[in-house]
C-alpha cells in the first residue's frame, strides 16, 4: 500500500492537502487536535470556555468565525484539559454541573462527543450546536430548504419566517427520534453529519422530535438536541448523553453504524459498557398489523425502543440495569403497558399483547395510530406553518360519513380559525340507543379540548389537559400526551335518519388565529 507521502507526489501542487501527525498542539489559548485522517481534519478548542473555534477539513475552514460551536449557547467558562492515550485524544470540559467530552480516534474524520449533566442547564435545554460556514455548507439534509430561514421575515415569535412566499422554521427540520439516526449539512465539496445512536438519557420517547438543522443566514447550524422545552412530555434525565458523533466527509454520506465502544476505556463519566447492560426480548401481539409496531422502555434514568419484526418479535437495545415501564404501540398509539426488570449480562424474556378496543362501530374517521395521518393538511404540517399558502383551506369543514374523503376532515381545529368541525351521518333505528363518541387527540395547545353537540344535545366540557407550555402545531409538532375523550351520548339522542355532530374547541384561554387554543385529531369513532 502506498504511503500518504508517496500519494502526495502524484498530486498537482494545487490539489495537495498537508498531512500532520495525530496529536494535540497546545497554545496559550487553545488545544489544536489533528485527527490524522486521510481527508485531513484539524479542529481547535478554546481552553477557557470549550468552544470549537476552528474546524479545518480537507483544507477548508468549516467553522463559522463569528461564534463558536458548543453546548447550549456556550458554557461561558469551563475547566478544559486535553489528553492523548495511544490512538485516542480526549478533550474534557467541566463546570460544576456539566462535563462535555470531545473524543478523536487516530485516522478518523469524526469528532465524537458525550455530555454528562447533574442538573439541567439554566437555559432550560441541553443541546450541541455546530455553527458552520454556510458558504461552503449551504444545504440541509434530509428535508432541504424547509428550515432555511435566511433572508426571511418573522411571522411568529422569532422562529417562524416567511421566505419567498413560503413559511420556514428550524423546527421543520425535525424527525422522530426512532427514525433520526443521521442529519447533515452539506455543500458541493463537503458534508458534515450528526450521527445519533444513543438516546437513552434524552427525553420524550421514540416519537419525540426536535430541531436538527437551520441555515439562518449567518451560518448553517447542525444540532443535537438532547432535551428541551419543545413539546416535552416527560422530565429531563440526568447522566451521560451520548456518545454522538460529528462526521466529516467530502461527498459521500456516512453510515450510521459507528462503533463507540472504545469509550469504555477513556474514563468517560457515566458511560456504561455493553458488558454491564442487559436486554429484553419477546413477542408483541394483538395490534393491527397494517401499522408498524414499536416497543418502548423507560424509567427516570433511561429510555429505549425498537420496531418489532413483521411477526412481532423484538430484542431491545442494550439497556442499563433497572425496572422499566414497557409500552407497545400500534403506530404511535399505546395499546398495552407492563413492567419489566433488566439485569446486567442477561436477556429477559417478556411478551406483550394489546389492541384497540371500542365496541360496535357506527362510524370511524381516521385510524387509531396516534397520528393525524390522512386528515386535511396533515401531510404538510411537519414542514410548514398552518398559514402557508400551500395549505388547503382549514374550514370550518363538514364531513359526511359515507361520502366525504378523509382529507375533508381537518387534522386540527383552532378556536379562532375553524371551530367547530361538523359531522353528518345516517343512523338506523337500531343505532338510537346509548352510544360513545371517542375523540382521540395527539396534542393540545392552550388548554384546547373538545366539546360535542349531537343534534340538540350538548355534551359536558372535559377537564383541561396538562399544559405542555409549548407551541406545537405551528412549529411542526403533532405529538403530545395523546388525550382520548369519551363522550357518553344518552339513548334517544341519536335519531333514525340524519344526525349532526359538532366538535368545538373549548378553553378558558384565547389567542389569535393559529395560536388560539387548539388540538390535533388522531381518530374519531362513534360506537355502541
UniProtKB/Swiss-Prot annotation:
Gene3D superfamilies listed in its UniProt record = 2.70.98.10, Carboxypeptidase-like, regulatory domain, Galactose-binding domain-like
* CDD domains referenced in this protein's UniProt entry, alphabetically: RGL4_C, RGL4_M, RGL4_N
Using the UniProt annotation, give the residues that carry a glycan (glycosylation sites).
46, 148, 351
Q: Where is the signal peptide?
A: 1-20
Which cellular compartments is it found in? Answer: Secreted
Keyword Coiled coil among UniProt keywords: no
Q: According to its UniProt entry, what is the function of this protein?
A: Pectinolytic enzymes consist of four classes of enzymes: pectin lyase, polygalacturonase, pectin methylesterase and rhamnogalacturonase. Degrades the rhamnogalacturonan I (RG-I) backbone of pectin.
Q: What is this protein called?
A: Probable rhamnogalacturonate lyase A
Q: Which organism is it from?
A: Aspergillus fumigatus (strain ATCC MYA-4609 / CBS 101355 / FGSC A1100 / Af293)
Name of encoding gene:
rglA
